[in-house]
Design a protein with these regions (language model features):
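Extended, helix-rich architectural segments
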Residues: 1-139
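A general structural signal for short secondary-structure junctions and capping/turn motifs
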Residues: 118-123, 154-156, 170-172, 244-247
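N-terminal start-of-domain structural block
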Residues: 1-39, 191-224, 230, 235
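Extended, regular secondary-structure scaffolds
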Residues: 128-221
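Extended, charged amphipathic alpha-helical segments
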Residues: 198-308
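Short, well-ordered loop/turn elements at secondary-structure boundaries
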Residues: 123-126, 158-161, 250, 285
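A structural detector for beta-sheet-dominated domains
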Residues: 7, 91, 132, 144, ...
Length: 308
């Protein structure tokens, strides 16, 4: 029976409070296989790397426009601006507390961090604040995306956080580094792309609880544009095909029926843009026209209007 499972993109374990390499390995593998792909898809959409740009290329002689309507970024930036465009203000009746909070927020540039956390939470559905001590023993805080960090919860009714994992890989490297973060210690660890975890040095921390806090966009931990991803992709495809049709008609082939053109005749027509054709005896009247495929302009416009 699996010791770790996912419920609403929350990683949960059925084991005790003991953090072992076996449990962490299972959690990392689950994170890699079940969650990371969707996070990267959401990040790509926010960064304008949409599905239409990744489709197979068409033949070189065919129009191949790739248009992106980045409604994902528009939705996230608009919502984040409304949510936290005005920075958070924190006050306390005790002046000493006010001073401490002001210093902490200044050192950690919390206005920027809070904005990035709000944006990140909208893109991924949730995000994390990680608190740590720097080399000067000052308490610092930074933000982390769920692509390389997650919290494992117990399976009690409260789903209490048991430990957090933070890991990263260098490009084209099969081995990564990171930490396993518990209530009382930081465990250095190595990670493989297959999800194997090996513990290293252990260091006690001062917080008496996991110094990682999750911020959620909604209970389901869905990104803010999750429900319209398919509509955005369909709009990109429809607009790209419409642009392809415009290019097709601009480069349409000319057909000339009922008269034999020599090479110099064709060249003269192209340069002067004039046709001077006449009926030759009892033969058919010469015909000049562009080759056209059936137009789907109205259908495409209706589809684009519907998707918008």
């Amino acid at each position: 029976m699996a010791k770790v499972f996912v419920n609403k993109r929350k990683v949960i374990t059925t084991t005790s409070d003991v953090v072992t390499e076996e449990v962490v390995t299972e959690a990392v593998r689950l994170h890699m296989s079940k969650l990371v792909k969707n996070y990267i898809e959401s990040e790509d959409m926010y960064l304008s790397q949409h599905e239409v740009l990744k489709m197979a290329k068409k033949d070189s002689w065919k129009p191949d426009n790739r248009l992106v309507f980045n409604y994902a970024k528009y939705i996230v930036d608009t919502f984040t601006g409304y949510q936290i465009g005005v920075p958070v203000k924190i006050k306390h009746e005790d002046e000493n507390v006010n001073e401490f909070v002001a210093d902490f927020r200044k050192i950690n540039d919390m206005e920027d961090s809070e904005f990035e956390l709000a944006k990140m939470s909208s893109v991924f559905g949730h995000a994390f604040i990680y608190v740590y001590q720097d080399e000067y023993k000052q308490t610092r805080a930074t933000y982390n995306s769920p692509i390389n960090m997650f919290i494992v919860h117990d399976n009690s009714i409260e789903e209490r956080p048991l430990f957090a994992v933070r890991y990263t890989f260098n490009e084209n490297n099969q081995e990564g580094i990171g930490q396993v973060i518990t209530n009382d210690e930081l465990i250095d660890a190595t990670f493989t792309t297959f999800g194997m975890v090996s513990f290293g040095e252990r260091t006690q921390h001062i917080y008496n609880s996991i110094p990682v806090v999750g911020l959620i966009e909604n209970e389901e931990r869905q990104c803010i544009f999750e429900s319209v991803k398919t509509l955005i992709n369909a709009l990109n495809k429809a607009a790209s095909e419409k642009a392809n049709d415009v290019d097709y008609f601009a480069d349409a082939y000319l057909k000339v029926l009922g008269v034999e053109l020599q090479e110099e005749d064709a060249s003269q027509i192209r340069e002067n843009r004039i046709f001077n054709l006449w009926k030759n005896g009892d033969g058919a009247l010469p015909e000049v026209a562009f080759l056209e495929k059936p137009s789907s302009d109205t259908t495409q416009e209706n589809l684009i209007s519907l998707l918008k």
